[in-house]
C-alpha cells in the first residue's frame, strides 16, 4: 500500500517530467527525474509543497481532459503541445506553469551539474578558515538568559549593531533563526541541499502579485550576506539627500553616512572585480558597453581571494566572499557577544511601555527568553513587521507598508562559441548608463551551473536543445528603482508579501530589457531569449523591440533580492513607524536596524546601505543605553 501511495504521489511529477524533458529525446529517466526533483520539493514549506503538487496534479489531469490520455502515453511533440495549450489559457496560468518549470529545472539542473559544481568548489584551498564565533545552539541555551542588549538577526544590520554594542562594553546576545554553516559544508554538500538549507522557505518565497516576484532571502548565521552576490555599491548622494530631506532622516546625511559607508567598506574589504577572474560573461558586457559608448565598470565586491567559481548564491566554498559571518560577527564575539542559533524570535517582551527582552522558539517548540533593556530588531524587511505585530507593537498604520523590492529581470543571449557564464564571478560588471536617468542598473549576472535553466523557452525537444546549448549562453540582468507599493502581512502565522508592480516601474523594465537586448546583440549574440512565455528567440534588435512593445507586462519573469522600507525611519510620525534615531515609535527600548528602515529604494544592491544605517542606529542605541546605566 505504501509503495502504491508513493507511486500515486510521484506520478504527476513523472508525468510533467516526461513532457518537459522527454526521456526518449535524451531527458532523464522518470525515476531519476522524480528523485532529483523530490530532493528539493520535500524541503519546501508545507504550503509551497502543497501548491507544487496540486499544480502538477492539475497538469496531469488536463492531459486526460484534453487528449483522453496521460502525458507519458503521448508522443513527445504532443506532450509539449498540451503544455503550450494550457499555458495559453491566461497570463496567470502561464505564470503558474512557468513557476513549476522553474522549480523542476532548478532541482534537475543542480543535480545534473552537481559533480562539476563540487569539483570546482574543491579546486582551490579556502581563501581563509572559518572565523572564531561564539555560537550556542538554542537546544543548549538555558531557558532564561540575561544581557544588556539583544539583537534579533545576524545579517548585515544585526552584525554591525552587535559589534558596535559589544565594543561599547555591553553584554550582547544575538538571536538567529538559522544555523551556522562551515566552509567545509559549502565544499562538499550537494547544491540542492545548500540552496534549500540556506534560504528562507527553501528559496521558494514569492511576493504575490501580477506578476508574482520570486523573493529569495538568506537564513543563516550571517543572514543574506552568506548567499548574496557580494555586490557592494554605495547609495548615490541623491538617494542619501532624499532620505535626509524628504524623510527628515538625519542619520542619512551624506557627511555622517559617508563615514559609516567607509567603515562598512573597510569591514567587508570591498574592491572591484579583477578582470582575470571576471569570466567571459562579464567581459562581454564591458565590451558591448564600450562599443555602444555606455558607461560600465567592474562591480565592487566584498570578495578578497575570490577565484570565480560562481557559487556565491549557495555559500562560498572558499570563504572568499567576505560576508559578516567572517568579519563583523567574529569582531562582535571577540568583544564578548554571543550568538544563539536555531532561535526564531516570536515576540518582544514589554510592559508599561518599555521592552525588557524577547522570547524565541527552538526547533522542538520549546521557548527561551533573553532579558535585556535594549532590543534591536534586525530580522529583515519581510520579517520585522510580523515580529512587531506579534509583540503587540504593530499599531503604526504604515508598518508593513512601503515595501520596495528593486525588481529584477534578465535576458539571455546565444553565442556561436562557448561563454560558460558560470565560470567566473556570479555578478561581475555593471552598466551605469541608465542608472541616473531611468533608475535602471544593468549587471552581468549568472547562476551556479544548472540552476538558471528556467530562462530557456519551450518544453520537450525545444527545451532540451536549449539545455544542450547552455555553455553558449550569456545572461545580463537589470534592476529598476521602484516606489514602496508592496505590503507585508501575517496570515495564520505566515508572512505574506504582496507586490503589484506600478506602471512607472513597468516602463523602466521596458527600458531595461531594450538596453540589455542592445548589449547582447552588440556583444555578438545571434539570438536573444526574453523568458516571456510563448515568445520565440529574437534574431534582431527591431524584432526584440517589437515583442517587448506587444508583450503583456504581467507575463515578465521578475525576481527581487532587495526588500526594503516596511518600517521606514524618519521624522514624520504619521509616515514612519521608526523615528529619525532608529527607535520604534510607541515603546521604549526597541530599535530597528535592518533594510526595513530604509525609507525608499536605495536604487543599488543594499548591503552597504543597510550596514551603514545599522551603524548609525547602533551609535544612537549605545548613547541611550550607556547614558542610563
From Swiss-Prot:
It comes from the Bacteria. Keywords: FAD, Flavoprotein, Oxidoreductase. PROSITE patterns: GMC_OXRED_2. This is Uncharacterized GMC-type oxidoreductase Rv0492c. GO terms for molecular function: flavin adenine dinucleotide binding; oxidoreductase activity, acting on CH-OH group of donors. One of its GO terms (cellular component) is cytosol. Its cofactor is FAD. SUPFAM superfamilies: FAD/NAD(P)-binding domain (SSF51905). Its EC number is 1.1.-.-. InterPro entries: FAD/NAD-bd_sf (IPR036188), GMC_OxRdtase_N (IPR000172), GMC_OxRtase_C (IPR007867). Belongs to the GMC oxidoreductase family. The active site is at residue 562.
Amino acid at each position: 500500500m505504501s509503495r502504491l501511495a508513493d507511486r500515486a504521489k510521484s506520478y504527476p511529477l513523472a508525468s510533467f517530467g516526461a513532457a518537459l524533458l522527454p526521456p526518449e529525446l535524451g531527458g532523464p529517466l522518470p525515476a531519476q527525474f522524480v528523485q532529483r526533483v523530490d530532493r528539493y520539493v520535500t524541503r519546501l514549506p508545507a504550503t509551497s509543497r502543497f501548491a507544487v503538487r496540486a499544480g502538477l496534479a492539475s497538469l496531469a489531469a488536463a492531459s486526460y481532459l484534453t487528449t483522453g490520455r496521460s502525458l507519458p502515453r503521448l508522443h513527445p511533440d504532443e506532450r509539449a503541445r498540451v503544455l503550450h495549450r494550457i499555458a495559453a489559457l491566461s497570463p496567470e496560468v502561464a505564470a503558474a506553469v512557468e513557476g513549476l518549470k522553474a522549480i523542476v529545472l532548478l532541482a534537475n539542473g543542480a543535480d545534473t551539474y552537481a559533480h562539476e559544481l563540487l569539483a570546482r568548489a574543491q579546486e582551490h584551498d579556502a581563501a581563509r578558515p572559518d572565523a572564531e564565533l561564539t555560537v550556542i545552539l538554542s537546544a543548549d541555551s538555558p531557558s532564561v538568559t540575561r544581557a544588556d542588549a539583544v539583537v534579533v538577526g545576524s545579517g548585515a544590520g544585526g552584525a554591525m549593531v552587535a559589534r558596535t554594542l559589544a565594543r561599547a562594553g555591553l553584554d550582547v546576545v544575538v538571536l538567529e533563526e538559522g544555523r551556522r554553516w562551515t566552509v567545509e559544508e559549502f565544499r562538499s554538500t550537494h547544491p540542492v541541499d545548500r540552496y534549500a538549507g540556506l534560504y528562507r522557505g527553501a528559496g521558494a518565497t514569492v511576493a504575490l502579485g501580477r506578476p508574482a516576484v520570486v523573493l529569495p532571502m538568506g537564513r543563516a548565521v550571517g543572514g543574506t550576506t552568506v548567499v548574496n552576490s557580494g555586490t557592494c555599491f554605495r547609495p548615490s548622494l541623491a538617494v542619501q539627500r532624499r532620505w535626509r530631506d524628504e524623510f527628515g532622516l538625519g542619520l542619512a546625511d551624506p557627511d555622517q553616512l559617508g563615514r559609516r559607508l567607509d567603515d562598512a567598506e573597510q569591514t567587508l574589504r570591498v574592491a572591484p572585480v579583477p578582470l582575470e577572474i571576471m569570466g567571459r560573461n562579464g567581459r562581454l558586457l564591458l565590451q558591448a558597453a564600450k562599443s555602444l559608448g555606455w558607461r560600465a565598470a567592474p562591480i565592487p565586491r566584498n570578495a578578497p581571494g575570490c577565484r570565480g567559481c560562481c557559487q556565491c548564491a549557495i555559500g562560498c566554498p572558499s570563504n572568499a566572499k567576505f560576508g559578516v559571518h567572517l568579519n563583523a560577527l567574529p569582531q562582535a564575539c571577540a568583544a564578548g557577544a554571543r550568538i544563539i542559533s536555531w532561535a526564531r524570535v516570536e515576540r518582544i517582551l514589554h510592559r508599561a511601555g518599555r521592552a525588557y527582552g524577547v522570547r524565541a522558539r527552538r526547533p522542538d517548540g520549546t521557548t527561551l527568553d533573553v532579558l535585556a533593556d535594549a532590543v534591536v530588531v534586525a530580522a529583515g524587511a519581510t520579517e520585522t513587521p510580523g515580529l512587531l505585530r506579534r509583540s503587540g507593537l504593530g499599531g503604526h498604520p504604515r508598518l508593513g507598508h512601503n515595501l520596495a523590492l528593486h525588481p529584477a529581470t534578465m535576458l539571455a543571449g546565444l553565442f556561436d562559441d562557448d561563454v560558460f557564464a558560470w565560470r567566473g564571478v556570479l555578478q561581475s560588471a555593471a552598466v551605469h548608463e541608465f542608472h541616473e536617468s531611468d533608475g535602471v542598473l544593468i549587471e552581468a549576472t549568472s547562476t551556479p551551473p544548472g540552476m538558471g535553466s528556467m530562462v530557456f523557452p519551450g518544453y520537450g525537444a525545444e527545451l532540451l536543445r536549449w539545455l544542450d546549448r547552455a555553455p553558449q549562453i550569456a545572461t545580463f540582468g537589470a534592476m529598476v528603482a521602484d516606489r514602496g507599493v508592496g505590503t507585508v502581512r501575517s496570515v495564520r502565522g505566515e508572512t505574506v508579501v504582496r507586490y503589484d508592480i506600478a506602471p512607472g516601474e513597468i516602463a523602466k523594465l521596458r527600458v531595461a530589457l531594450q538596453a540589455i537586448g542592445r548589449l547582447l546583440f552588440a556583444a555578438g549574440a545571434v539570438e536573444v531569449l526574453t523568458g516571456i512565455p510563448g515568445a520565440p528567440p529574437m534574431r534582431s534588435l527591431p524584432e526584440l523591440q517589437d515583442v517587448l512593445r506587444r508583450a503583456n507586462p504581467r507575463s515578465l519573469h521578475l525576481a527581487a533580492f532587495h526588500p526594503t522600507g516596511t518600517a521606514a525611519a524618519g521624522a514624520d510620525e504619521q509616515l514612519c513607524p521608526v523615528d529619525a534615531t532608529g527607535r520604534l515609535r510607541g515603546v521604549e527600548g526597541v530599535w530597528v536596524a535592518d533594510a526595513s528602515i530604509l525609507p525608499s529604494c536605495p536604487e543599488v544592491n543594499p548591503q552597504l546601505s543597510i550596514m551603514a544605517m545599522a551603524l548609525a542606529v547602533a551609535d544612537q542605541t549605545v548613547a541611550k543605553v550607556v547614558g542610563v546605566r
